[in-house]
Structure formats: structure tokens, C-alpha cells
Amino acid sequence: MDLSNRTVVQVVVLALVAQVTLSQHWSYGWLPGGKRSVGELEATIKMMDTGGVVALPEETSAHVSERLRPYDVILKKWMPHK
């Protein structure tokens, strides 16, 4: 009886592992492995009409530097030679 229970568990685990390893996640516009086709990316850039450059507003970049300021203090405390 122990051997049959063990066999059933092994078959179930094998089936689950096979399903996970053989299945692929597909999203609209994305290729397997998380790669996008170049044509779709170019179309997206043209639709945005930015020429491929996205500029951040000045307020956002200032806010980011303010958020990173405590890390600068920590780095100077622990690595004063830099």
C-alpha cells in the first residue's frame, strides 16, 4: 500500500512539474521570454510621437534626488573616502 501511495504522489508531482516547465506565459504583443518584437516597439514610439526620447518633468527629477539624499548620507558615513 505504501508503494502505491508513493507512486501516485510521484506521478502527480511529475505532472505538475511538466505542466509548469512546458507551459509558456503569453501576453498580448509579447514574445516568449519577455521579448517584444522590434516592429511593435517602433510602432509604439511613433504613436507616442516622442522620437524615442521620454523626458522627465523637472519636479520629478528633483523629487527623486531628495528621496535619494538619505542614501548619500549613509554612503558618506560608511565610505568617507569616496
Swiss-Prot record:
Which residues are the signal sequence here?
A: 1-23
According to the UniProt entry, its GO molecular function terms are: gonadotropin hormone-releasing hormone activity; gonadotropin-releasing hormone receptor binding
Subcellular locations according to the entry: Secreted
Q: Does Signal appear among the keywords?
A: yes
Tissue specificity, per the record, is: Brain.
* One Gene Ontology term, aspect cellular component: extracellular space
Q: Which domain of life is it from?
A: Eukaryota
- Keyword Signal, does the record have it? yes
Main localization, broad class: secreted
A Pfam family this chain is assigned to: GnRH
Identify residues that carry Pyrrolidone carboxylic acid: 24
Query: Which keywords appear in this protein's UniProt record, sorted alphabetically?
Result: Amidation, Cleavage on pair of basic residues, Hormone, Pyrrolidone carboxylic acid, Secreted, Signal
Provide the positions where the record notes the PTM Glycine amide: 33
Family that this chain belongs to = Belongs to the GnRH family.
Q: What does this protein do?
A: Stimulates the secretion of gonadotropins.
Task: Please state what the protein is called.
Answer: Progonadoliberin-3
Please give the organism: Oncorhynchus nerka
